[in-house]
């Protein structure tokens, strides 16, 4: 027996797996690197001080500042991940809409093409990404220089304030400074679930082929 997955469904799963792995692995990799750097700084300070505590302290404090700046990289990483997670969703919807020839890459329109409807959970995911995640992405990409809400003010302000209240993001002096990693993962998981359902509605499935009694060639046995 052999299982063959439609290329679009395979793309949805492989890109999800890649993004999910990045989210899961980066914090531990960063912490390992920071720990190693801290150990090297301490060793350097001890060697340079030769027993003089004040020299050790000054050297350590001077060198450790470059390690502390690495925590800023995690903030930038999470911002970049949010942008990539949204792009994964947006580009896949565009691909699906072109494949099935609908005018707009909206999940409901893609489903309606096949006389199908999305359940309440998937509708909520679609609306959340459109109403909350997309404005956040737009702010990060186009307007995160201390002038929050300047573009598309009404929608952006409502969305950002909602995310602030939920503690999904932090804002300082008009700039989005941090995004909760668990929030990004939750968005990614929801997008993946919705995209897989749309792929199923479009007929993009995994098909299991195998032999049946009396047949010399493989035939479809089941799909999912």
Regions inferred by a protein language model and the residue ranges of each:
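Flexible secondary-structure boundary motifs
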Residues: 76-185, 218-222
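Extended intrinsically disordered or low-complexity regions, especially N/C-terminal cytosolic tails and loops
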Residues: 1-79, 152-224
């Amino acid at each position: 027996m052999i299982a063959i997955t439609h290329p679009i469904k395979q793309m949805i799963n492989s890109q999800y797996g890649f993004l999910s792995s990045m989210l899961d692995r980066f914090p531990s990799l960063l912490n390992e690197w920071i720990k190693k750097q801290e150990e090297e700084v301490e060793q350097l300070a001890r060697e340079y001080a030769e027993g003089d505590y004040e020299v050790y302290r000054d050297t350590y404090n001077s060198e450790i500042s470059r390690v502390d700046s690495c925590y800023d990289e995690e903030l930038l990483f999470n911002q970049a991940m949010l942008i990539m997670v949204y792009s994964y969703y947006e580009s896949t919807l565009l691909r699906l809409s072109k494949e099935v020839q609908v005018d707009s890459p909206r999940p409901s329109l893609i489903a309606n093409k096949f006389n199908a409807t999305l359940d309440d959970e998937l509708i909520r995911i679609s609306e959340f990404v459109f109403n909350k995640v997309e404005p956040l992405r737009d702010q990060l990409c186009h307007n995160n220089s201390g002038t929050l809400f300047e573009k598309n003010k009404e929608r952006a302000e409502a969305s950002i304030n909602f995310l602030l209240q939920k503690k999904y993001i932090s804002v300082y002096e008009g700039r989005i400074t941090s995004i909760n990693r668990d929030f990004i993962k939750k968005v990614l998981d929801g997008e993946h679930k919705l995209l897989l359902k749309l792929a199923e509605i479009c007929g993009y499935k995994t098909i299991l082929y195998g032999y049946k009694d009396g047949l010399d060639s493989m035939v479809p046995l089941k799909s999912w």
